[in-house]
Design a protein with these regions (language model features):
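PAPS-dependent sulfotransferase catalytic domain
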Residues: 76-167, 181-192
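A structural motif corresponding to the C-terminal end of an alpha-helix
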Residues: 69, 131-137, 220-223
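PAPS-dependent sulfotransferase catalytic core
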Residues: 1-69
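Pocket-edge structural micro-motifs
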Residues: 3, 26, 77-78, 214
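Generic structural signal for helix capping and beta-alpha/helix-loop junctions
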Residues: 32-34, 107, 174
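PAPS-dependent sulfotransferases, especially Golgi type II membrane carbohydrate sulfotransferases
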Residues: 163-231
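Aromatic-acidic/polar surface patches that form glycan- and anion
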Residues: 1, 5, 121, 145, ...
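A basic- and aromatic-enriched beta-loop-alpha substructure that forms the phosphate/nucleotide-
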Residues: 45-101
Length: 231
């Protein structure tokens, strides 16, 4: 699942991890991304120390590692901006691809609370479009999932050829052993959740300096949104 920041990506990972037939992995390219970019993210050194920092080895694990006993579905949550240019896109061909999007004004209005000067490469929209053009796959919008969790998850499962499981609609509060080591910095809200929260329509007011970025994001979002699945 190729996602951007502030798109309910961790809640969607929770939904999949609630299935008894599914194993999940949390942002497997994060260590690679931090080691290459030097981005000063919270817990950076621990992430790099505890993760595989070579993109080829990460992709090999995703495509070749055996399934744990009793598991038949493998779900990887990715932040698409971790997909740096040096990653050979053809290495992704063996995987099924899906995309989680959010209206860029809503995304930026939320993201600016944690990073005041984001740039396009922080958001992953351009990379999402790149991967979608290469491999296709279902597109889901975070607002649609929040408004209609069960119908949207059913539609997503159907698009992926996986049977829907009602267990995806709720989960126990608290951390998981599948959460990345960075979870304590970012996952407080998810740790307190027991399901998808209600959709709250909010005014997407942006600082004037971010209006040009919102406009740059808009064509990428619109291209993906034109293919979004609905119940």
């Amino acid at each position: 699942m190729w996602s951007g920041p502030r798109t309910i990506s961790t809640a969607l990972m929770r939904a999949w991890s609630s299935r008894p037939d599914t194993v999940v992995i949390d942002e497997p390219l994060y260590g690679f991304y931090l080691s290459r970019t030097g981005a000063p993210h919270p817990g950076r050194d621990e992430v790099i120390k505890t993760m595989n920092n070579g993109w080829r080895a990460v992709i090999d694990d995703l495509t070749q590692a055996p399934f744990p006993a009793g598991k038949t579905v493998f779900y990887a949550k990715h932040m698409t901006h971790h997909l740096l240019p040096e990653v050979d896109r053809s290495a992704l061909r063996a995987l099924r691809h899906a995309y989680l999007i959010r209206d860029p004004r809503q995304l930026l209005a939320s993201y600016v609370k944690v990073r005041t000067q984001p740039v396009l490469d922080d958001l992953g929209l351009a990379q999402q479009v790149e991967i979608f053009r290469m491999f296709g796959g279902p597109v889901v919008d975070s607002s649609d999932i929040l408004q209609q969790p069960e119908p949207m998850l059913r539609a997503l499962c159907d698009a992926l050829g996986v049977a829907f499981d009602p267990a995806m609609l709720s989960w126990p509060a608290g951390p998981r052993d599948t959460d990345g080591v960075w979870a304590r910095y970012w996952y407080d809200r998810v740790w307190r959740s027991t399901g998808f929260g209600p959709y709250l329509e909010q005014a997407a007011e942006l600082p004037p300096g971010l209006e040009p970025l919102a406009e740059r994001c808009r064509p990428f979002y619109e291209e993906l949104s034109a293919h979004r699945i609905r119940p």
